[in-house]
Amino acid sequence: MALRPLHDRVIVKRLDNERKTASGIVIPDSAAEKPDQGEVVAVGPGKKTEDGKVLPVDLKAGDKVLFGKYAGQSVKVDGEELLVIREEEILAVIQ
């Protein structure tokens, strides 16, 4: 099954970032305050304005992004955990 995001939504695959302190203690996701990282899998066409114009999404498939811990909606597709996130919930693109 494939997902095609609508409007200004973006499908993101969360990257596994094991968080450790300098001494090697693993910090669980529930205690981490840093934003999560992910890779953009698919991008919607953009958000429609009141006059009917489409504002394209400023991301593309393959971009590495930062997003908040509670951003988006989690979905499982073919056993893979993905997030459907609005463009405005993405904090930054990692370059």
UniProtKB/Swiss-Prot annotation:
<dbReference type="GO" id="GO:0005737">
    <property type="term" value="C:cytoplasm"/>
</dbReference>
<dbReference type="GO" id="GO:0051082">
    <property type="term" value="F:unfolded protein binding"/>
</dbReference>
<dbReference type="GO" id="GO:0051085">
    <property type="term" value="P:chaperone cofactor-dependent protein refolding"/>
</dbReference>
<dbReference type="GO" id="GO:0044183">
    <property type="term" value="F:protein folding chaperone"/>
</dbReference>
<keyword id="KW-0143">Chaperone</keyword>
<dbReference type="InterPro" id="IPR020818">
    <property type="entry name" value="Chaperonin_GroES"/>
</dbReference>
<dbReference type="GO" id="GO:0005524">
    <property type="term" value="F:ATP binding"/>
</dbReference>
<keyword id="KW-0963">Cytoplasm</keyword>
<dbReference type="InterPro" id="IPR037124">
    <property type="entry name" value="Chaperonin_GroES_sf"/>
</dbReference>
<dbReference type="GO" id="GO:0051087">
    <property type="term" value="F:protein-folding chaperone binding"/>
</dbReference>
<dbReference type="InterPro" id="IPR018369">
    <property type="entry name" value="Chaprnonin_Cpn10_CS"/>
</dbReference>
<dbReference type="InterPro" id="IPR011032">
    <property type="entry name" value="GroES-like_sf"/>
</dbReference>
<dbReference type="GO" id="GO:0046872">
    <property type="term" value="F:metal ion binding"/>
</dbReference>
<comment type="similarity">
    <text>Belongs to the GroES chaperonin family.</text>
</comment>
<comment type="function">
    <text>Together with the chaperonin GroEL, plays an essential role in assisting protein folding. The GroEL-GroES system forms a nano-cage that allows encapsulation of the non-native substrate proteins and provides a physical environment optimized to promote and accelerate protein folding. GroES binds to the apical surface of the GroEL ring, thereby capping the opening of the GroEL channel.</text>
</comment>
<dbReference type="Pfam" id="PF00166">
    <property type="entry name" value="Cpn10"/>
</dbReference>
<comment type="subunit">
    <text>Heptamer of 7 subunits arranged in a ring. Interacts with the chaperonin GroEL.</text>
</comment>
<protein>
    <recommendedName>
        <fullName>Co-chaperonin GroES</fullName>
    </recommendedName>
</protein>
